[in-house]
Amino acid sequence: MKKARKITATLLALAMMTGVMATASGCQSGPAASSAAPVASQEAANSEAPAAEGKTLNIWCWNDEFQSRFNDYYPEVKEVASDKSTTTLNDGTVVKWTINPNDNNNYQNKLDQALLSQESAAADDKIDIFLVEADYALKYVDSEYTLDVKKDIGLTDSDLSNQYQYTQDIVTDKNGALKGTTWQATPGLFAYRRSIAKAVLGTDDPAKVQESLSDWDKFNSVAAQASAKGYKMLSGYDDSYRTFSNNVSAPWVTDTTATVDANLMNWVKQTKEYAQKGYNNKTSLWDDKWQADQGPSGKVLGFFYSTWGINFTLLGNSLKTPVAEGGKEEVGNGVYGDYAVCQGPQSYYWGGTWICGAKGSDNIGTIKNVMKSLTSDSTIMKKITTDTQDYTNNKEAMEEIANSDFKSAFLGGQNHIKLFAEVAPKIDMSNAGPYDQGMNESMQKCFKDYFDGTVDLEKAKANFEKTVKEKYPEITEIKWPS
């Protein structure tokens, strides 16, 4: 893995005093950049985990996704509190859930504060497990606050042998130690509306649609065809971003220099063209209009989504009557059943959640059992996929489903696991780095004004440079492709 971000004492102090990194002017309107990872004291780094198992397991996360997976599939669960704040295990251990939403860097800021207090915290208050996302995983992986999955926790190479390599690469520290593990792999595909594909291309067959979208030139050609028939190719500015950003030639930052990859400028060029020609709906990721474009009133051909996005976001947005309002996940409710997936113009991944054991935990045995059960047990992982359509991190289980008669009703009877199984081994994490979240967010936000037509290209670049240098004072130079 690439060397970790260098954090100065001044920067760390600023992060802890303010709770967030400096907010830039000009184009910074969303969550702040990933704050600096807390630096462990020498005493914490050298301390040994207590031998006795505690009876309280503290798990920190930012939403209820892992909580649901844990409560539904961890074999040792005995009962769940009515308010879901605690889970009791068969041996009497009480799992306490701390869920702090991601908004405005809230999760990381509170996690950092808690980790800084980890050494002095009472045994039942210490964090035992915490979750991290791909975009900032290295921040914690390269700190002393994460346990070595093999050396400290006790999982073996055999336990981990069926996992996709990239899911281990992203949580391997600069010394080669594996510092986390995950139940999911998140290869990306292009999810398209079958009815719109028929109107534009004359077919909704995934193999034939893929032929029309297999590279960016073909993709752009179909965008023109869709526009001519009254449809949008994409909903907004950010939809294709991950497909470009996952195919860069180098990490964002080397020493004190940030380099904007040429492929990111290809995204800028394409997105500006789509905005000018009406090929997109000028939305932004996660806004109401973007989500509405995925539902019954939408006129958008497709969306770039990874595994979790299809079953967790797209399915929900496709329904006319949400499940919370009494609707059912079935054909006839909105456009459920009108989607299908194909590989699209380039392989990519998006997101993912990793389980990390926290330094100082007195529940090493329980952490080991949780990791082994939820990220290595092929039977459990196969059940997660068949129940939820989430793509799990077990090659054996996924190949079994890929080669079966499994069908997704949401995707019109398609076995999308087969496509994911083809794409997942191609994911390359060699250019991932600890700056990814902050740099990617800044790129998208600062160029939105350019896509909207309120600033020119040079101003958008200047805004990006200003934002980056305010977020990351250690970055002194930003290079653009010629």
Describe the residue ranges of each PLM region:
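Conserved N-terminal structural module of periplasmic/extracytoplasmic solute-binding proteins
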Residues: 9, 22-138, 382-385, 455-482
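Helix-loop-helix "hinge/cap" segment bordering the ligand-binding cleft or interdomain interface
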Residues: 150-161, 169-240, 252-285, 359-365, ...
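Short helix-initiation/N-cap motifs at beta->coil->alpha
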Residues: 100-113, 214-218, 282-296
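Long, aromatic- and glycine/proline-rich binding clefts that accommodate carbohydrate-like moieties
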Residues: 336-337, 385-449, 477-482
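Hydrophobic core
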Residues: 12, 16-20
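Hinge/lid segment of periplasmic solute-binding proteins
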Residues: 40-46, 108, 119, 130-189, ...
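Extracytoplasmic/periplasmic substrate-binding proteins
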Residues: 71-75, 266-369
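Periplasmic-binding protein-like
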Residues: 69, 194, 372-402
